[in-house]
UniProtKB/Swiss-Prot annotation:
Subunit note: Acetyl-CoA carboxylase is a heterohexamer composed of biotin carboxyl carrier protein (AccB), biotin carboxylase (AccC) and two subunits each of ACCase subunit alpha (AccA) and ACCase subunit beta (AccD).
Protein's recorded name: Acetyl-coenzyme A carboxylase carboxyl transferase subunit beta
GO cellular component, one term: acetate CoA-transferase complex
Compartment list: Cytoplasm
UniProt xrefs under PROSITE patterns: COA_CT_NTER
PANTHER family: ACETYL-COENZYME A CARBOXYLASE CARBOXYL TRANSFERASE SUBUNIT BETA, CHLOROPLASTIC
GO molecular function, one term: zinc ion binding
Function: Component of the acetyl coenzyme A carboxylase (ACC) complex. Biotin carboxylase (BC) catalyzes the carboxylation of biotin on its carrier protein (BCCP) and then the CO(2) group is transferred by the transcarboxylase to acetyl-CoA to form malonyl-CoA.
Domain annotation CoA carboxyltransferase N-terminal: ranges: 25-294
Name of the coding gene: accD
NCBIfam families with a match to the protein in the record: accD
């Protein structure tokens, strides 16, 4: 064997030990496809640091990072969906509920909490899109109404983060009824002179967009969020026309007056807090003017629990 063959033979030795990387350490941006360190992405509130894409966020984590730490109380957490119609399509509704609860870690598609935002009392709720597409059923309607009632009892503002495909097909008329139920509850809130701020995230569609999501005193969209009633393809097939670029995105809706503003998720606490302070004439030392330089306390993000 020549000296060259000996060197090549040694270089082909492969270690039997494989480097193991724990699952979930790295993730990929769904927009620019950059590989991201998951802990960094979480610290950035699920916003890609490379392209600024706002990824979908878990409802519980959204509320825990939006509200101040401490004094957060969940509303309607004991409510669970019931299969009153014994509905079955390709699967039984009961089976779909069980699967959604296991995968999402939530009992239904809306989480509601009362707490404080920058020192001001507030009630907030958020849709869990991973639970059957954030669809609105009886429990979602009931929890939202409880949130409205809590806001009236505490004489404070209500904020809702929407992320939904619409009404829940498996609950039929009982699901559609929630559109009227939630709208009527918001009318009572308005009659008491309390503000409702609706934040529409990606996606907000169907019966949710046609009811509570568009009834805010101020309607906010996250950047590039899909917001509408029917899908683009359905509309194009109906009107037999090509729709413009960016149709149903929050930037398009802002340009055409359908929403009031677009707010980056990382600035949501301060911007919404500033709006609530003005609407309720509440003077909080943590609220600064939008035109002022942000202070560190106002923009700090509260810690979320492990479940979020």
């Amino acid at each position: 064997m020549s000296w060259l063959e000996k060197i090549l033979e040694k270089s082909n030795i492969v270690s039997s030990r494989k480097a193991s990387i724990p699952e979930g350490v790295w993730t990929k941006c769904t927009s620019c496809e950059q590989v991201l360190y998951h802990a960094e992405l979480e610290r950035n509130l699920e916003v890609c640091p490379k392209c600024n894409h706002h990824m979908r966020m878990k409802a519980r984590r959204r509320l825990e990072t939006f509200l101040d730490e401490g004094n957060r109380v969940e509303l309607g957490g004991e409510l669970e969906p019931q299969d009153k119609l014994k509905f079955k399509d390709s699967k039984r509704y009961k089976e779909r509920i069980a699967a959604a609860q296991k995968s999402s870690g939530e009992k239904d598609a809306l989480v509601a909490m009362k707490g404080e935002l920058l020192g001001m009392p507030i009630v907030a709720c958020a849709f869990e899109f991973s639970f059957m597409g954030g669809s609105m059923g009886s429990v979602v309607g009931a929890r939202f109404v409880r949130a409205v009632e809590a806001a009236m009892e505490n004489n404070c503002a209500l904020v809702c983060f929407s992320a939904s495909g619409g009404a829940r097909m498996q609950e039929a008329l009982m699901s559609l009824m929630q559109m009227a139920k939630t709208s009527a509850a918001l009318e009572r809130l308005s009659a008491k002179g309390l503000p409702f701020i609706s934040v529409m995230t990606d996606p907000t569609m169907g019966g949710v967009s046609a009811s509570l999501a568009m009834l805010g005193d101020i309607n906010i969209g996250e950047p590039k969020a899909l917001i509408g009633f029917a899908g683009r393809r359905v509309i194009e097939q109906t009107v037999r026309e090509d729709l413009p670029e960016g149709f149903q995105r929050s930037e398009f809706l802002l340009e055409h007056g359908a929403i009031d503003m677009i707010v980056d998720r990382r600035e949501m606490r301060q911007r919404v807090g500033g709006l609530i302070a003005k609407l309720t004439n509440h003077k909080s030392p943590l609220v600064v003017s939008v035109n002022d330089s942000p202070n560190e306390a106002a923009y700090s993000v509260p810690e979320a629990n492990e479940k979020g």
